[in-house]
UniProtKB/Swiss-Prot annotation:
InterPro entries: PCD_sf (IPR036428), Pterin_deHydtase (IPR001533). Belongs to the pterin-4-alpha-carbinolamine dehydratase family. One of its GO terms (biological process) is tetrahydrobiopterin biosynthetic process. Gene3D superfamilies: Transcriptional coactivator/pterin dehydratase. CDD domains: PCD_DCoH_subfamily_b. This is Pterin-4-alpha-carbinolamine dehydratase. Its EC number is 4.2.1.96. It comes from the Eukaryota.
Length: 96
């Protein structure tokens, strides 16, 4: 699947979709977990993958809620790195 098709798939899911923001230069998604421990565990897994990809999210955590924004600052837009990390995050979230 090409980059455009993958981006469309990420933002067009009927439930819990990623939202394009700031002129389609950022992806945003909010996640909720049973408690803080599950949220933190999720963030830890994402952090390990982000380090492997050398691509780090902008995120916040309040108790059981994690908000994630993805963008590539060097290009001031979305790149393959953002799509790879978003797809990993979605897969990980399904397991939680």
């Amino acid at each position: 699947m090409n980059t455009s098709a993958r981006l469309l798939a990420l933002v067009s899911k009927s439930k819990n979709n990623w939202i394009l923001q700031q002129g389609d230069t950022k992806l945003f998604k909010s996640f909720r977990f049973k408690n803080f421990i599950e949220a933190w565990g999720f963030m830890s897994c994402v952090a390990l993958r982000a380090q492997q990809l050398n691509h780090h999210p902008e995120w916040t955590n309040v108790y059981n809620k994690v908000d994630i924004t993805l963008t590539t600052h060097d290009t001031k837009g979305l790149t393959e790195k953002d799509l790879k990390l978003a797809e990993f995050i979605d897969t990980l979230a399904k397991d939680n």
